[in-house]
Amino acid sequence: MEVDINGDSRSTLTTLPLPVAEGSSPGKAEAEKPRCSSTPCSPMRRTVSGYQILHMDSNYLVGFTTGEELLKLAQKCTGGEDSKGEAMPALRAKQLDTGLARSSRLYKTRSRYYQPYEIPAVNGRRRRRMPSSGDKCTKPLPYEPYKALHGPLPLCLLKGKRAHSKSLDYLNLDKMNIKEPADTEVLQYQLQHLTLRGDRVFARNNT
């Protein structure tokens, strides 16, 4: 017996269509892979086709239940035919409650993976993940001497000088006026004169 997300039962199908979903999913296998290798606990797994999604919140955290649990709930519900009218709202509320509880529990257990975490040491070196735009990182860095005393500089100060930052968040590429043609022209001019000077030196040495 299959149950909707809202809890409405569909009595037309007695079993979950697992082989059909597994057989006709060549493109679905790629979509069920984890979105990023840095999230070790991704809810997208290969067994999603055999699961019933109960609840999904805005963070794409999903509360699952297996087909066996749904069949047990259906057998409990259909065991008393006379009390079917009272059992259906209770079943619906119970499923929604379990979905909410499971999704919140998933969020609690996985919330630590959203903060910067230490990558395991490789060859004795300790590497750290690049801080994202939401992280507060005000450590004095060797390649950013102006950030030692204060936080990230505002946009008006960054427009005049080049931002020597490895993070693209400080570049503000959508708001900057990029003057690439002038730079390329100057570089081409300098390169041309350098090559001419080099040719003269080599010609002078050859003669």
Curated annotation (Swiss-Prot):
The modification Phosphoserine is found at S25, S167. The keyword Phosphoprotein applies. Highly expressed in photoreceptors. Keywords: Acetylation, Cell projection, Cilium, Cilium biogenesis/degradation, Cytoplasm, Inflammatory response, Phosphoprotein, Protein transport, Transport. GO terms for cellular component: ciliary transition zone; cytoplasm. It is found in: Cytoplasm; Cell projection, Cilium. Its main location: cytoplasm. The modification N-acetylmethionine is found at M1. One of its GO terms (biological process) is protein transport. It comes from the Eukaryota. Residues 1-41 are annotated as: Disordered. PANTHER family: MACROPHAGE IMMUNOMETABOLISM REGULATOR (PTHR31224:SF2), UNC119-BINDING PROTEIN C5ORF30 (PTHR31224). Belongs to the UNC119-binding protein family. Interacts with UNC119 and UNC119B; interaction preferentially takes place when UNC119 and UNC119B are unliganded with myristoylated proteins. Regulates the macrophage function, by enhancing the resolution of inflammation and wound repair functions mediated by M2 macrophages. The regulation of macrophage function is, due at least in part, to its ability to inhibit glycolysis. May also play a role in trafficking of proteins via its interaction with UNC119 and UNC119B cargo adapters: may help the release of UNC119 and UNC119B cargo or the recycling of UNC119 and UNC119B. May play a role in ciliary membrane localization via its interaction with UNC119B and protein transport into photoreceptor cells. This is Macrophage immunometabolism regulator. It comes from Mus musculus. The gene is Macir.
